[in-house]
């Protein structure tokens, strides 16, 4: 099979290569998937780059945790009726606090546990499906980890990003009123089109003042946070008493110093979101919800660009540059 690989961390153009690798076989409890689209998440790029001291955890890595395709074979213990099923995949490569799998979705074929290949919603194509594993499931967990959000007001920082854009739609579908923060006017349009009540330009507006104005001084029930270190003072200031901050990243500073009493005075709840560690029951609920929302056309996946496998290094650079209104996907 044709696959993208790397054997050392570093710049994309220097370490990623394309070549033939042995075809995998479906083992006990596994399915073999012909990959059609491979989603790229910031975590994939960080692993390849060696961000924050990350080391190679396997001698050779086929990158990318998310993808979509069709099942072409099954291993022992898996019903053969799954052959031909369109699926999206999660946790195909890597992980946090564990080495995880070595071989991800940036290849023509992948063998992985059957439960990690989920039936693709009828209304989504492979390119969209390749972004359900991390962006959409992280968004689901950030919105619903503590139950229903019906009637709540939610602030979503980074609302135009891959996770944020999904979170806006999932929260609105759940009955919440959403305020999103963005960094420019096109991003604001993108977020309002997804259903947000308001989109605030953090570069042009006093976000804290505007949130309190919009909520009549009450604040928000929940904050979904893309960069905890950068925004924790804001989050504490706009949070209602006993509200929750659900943070899924802190890239600007992996070891932020917490303003304890800003949160303690509100009786705040801090919820840290890790898409690789969603409890099994919650994951099944999330998978079912994403399918329902997608098939009801309440969830769309924004795509900024697609690249062929041969141009995977360019795709990684596109993710690193940031600012995309949508996901970057490698087609295979």
Predicted segments with their positions:
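Short amphipathic alpha-helix with an adjacent loop that forms part of the alpha/beta core around
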Residues: 207-217
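Short glycine-centered segments of the SAM/dcSAM-binding site in methyltransferase folds
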Residues: 86, 153, 177, 243-244, ...
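Glycine-rich phosphate-binding loop and adjacent beta-alpha segment
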Residues: 95, 182, 230-298, 332
